[in-house]
Amino acid sequence: MANPKNTESLAELKNRFADIDSVFVTEYRGLTVAQITELRRALGSDVQYSVAKNTLIKLAAKEAGIEGLDDILTGPTAVAFIKGEAVDAAKAMKKFASENKAFVIKGGYMDGNALSAAQVDAIAELDNRETTLAKLAGAMKGNLAKAAGLFNAPASQVARLGAALQEKKEA
């Protein structure tokens, strides 16, 4: 007979896997409760950071259609369930890992693909969505100004040529 606590935990994990955009898997061995609380605060409201049994995580992930996590689900494991922007969560986790050597990012899952620890680290190096859109808008604005200058240039050149011809004719 299944343990009721495990059954409840499995149902909760299934719900979390069904309602997320990406997942990062970490090892929390050696961290204090205060440090884990600090990490949860740094991750923000779009991320649920949970400690769970590897077996339950594997079962819930499999039922949610998420594959490729089995290799990294060893040892004491905590999972960051991310709804929305994964870049901000990756940045927060990378910063936390640099300040707390006991914290290890094992990998994750995003857009139908399993991620290695190096890939999660690479995600942390990306700009978030707002920054990328701001850069794109700035680049477009600059290019539009250049284009307007190019379109106006022939007209002004014709006007200068006309003025020069008129001066030459008068002389």
UniProtKB/Swiss-Prot annotation:
Any Gene Ontology biological process: translation
A GO molecular-function annotation: structural constituent of ribosome
Keywords: Ribonucleoprotein, Ribosomal protein, RNA-binding, rRNA-binding
InterPro entries linked: Ribosomal_uL10, Ribosomal_uL10-like_sf, Ribosomal_uL10_bac, Ribosomal_uL10_bac_type, Ribosomal_uL10_CS_bac
A cellular-component GO term for this protein: large ribosomal subunit
Assembly mode: Part of the ribosomal stalk of the 50S ribosomal subunit. The N-terminus interacts with L11 and the large rRNA to form the base of the stalk. The C-terminus forms an elongated spine to which L12 dimers bind in a sequential fashion forming a multimeric L10(L12)X complex.
Family per similarity comment: Belongs to the universal ribosomal protein uL10 family.
Function: Forms part of the ribosomal stalk, playing a central role in the interaction of the ribosome with GTP-bound translation factors.
Name under which the protein is recorded: Large ribosomal subunit protein uL10
Lineage per the UniProt record: Bacteria, Bacillati, Actinomycetota, Actinomycetes, Mycobacteriales
